[in-house]
Amino acid sequence: MATLESRLADMLKVPVEALGFQLWGIEYVQAGKHSILRVFIDGENGINIEDCANVSRQVSAVLDVEDPISTEYTLEVSSPGVDRPLFTAEQYAAYVGEDVKLQLTMPVAGSRNLKGAITQVDGQMLSLNVNGKELVVALDNIRKGNIIAKF
């Protein structure tokens, strides 16, 4: 069965793209009785607040009709930012050589939190150089992954 995030991504991809943006990813965070639905969008020329407002109105209209979430939630629409979250194999592959921070569901090499450089993405497997040691992580074991911004 598909996760809520993947069902929402399927539902919202076309409306977001119709406005000229890419649906970068979706996070659904339950926080007690109230939850947060984060929709990340990207565009060729970046994203501004007006873009987020326009996408928010469109996404809100779709969610009102489809009603995929039965509890109260807050909708947030934003750009992925400099420490952008990564959701798909294609996104990880686009950042080979970059440093990432991963939170895992199951430990790899004794840890659920890893920081290292992406060395390769092969199908649904991610290779990561962590302190000179090559680790392989299944993408479905990644609970959350973010680029580590360099300043």
Curated annotation (Swiss-Prot):
Which Gene3D superfamilies would you find in this protein's record? Ribosome maturation factor RimP, C-terminal domain, RimP-like superfamily, N-terminal
The main location is: cytoplasm
Q: Which GO terms describe its biological process?
A: ribosomal small subunit assembly; translation
Subcellular location, record wording: Cytoplasm
**Domain of life of the native organism:** Bacteria
Q: What does this protein do?
A: Required for maturation of 30S ribosomal subunits.
Protein known as? Ribosome maturation factor RimP
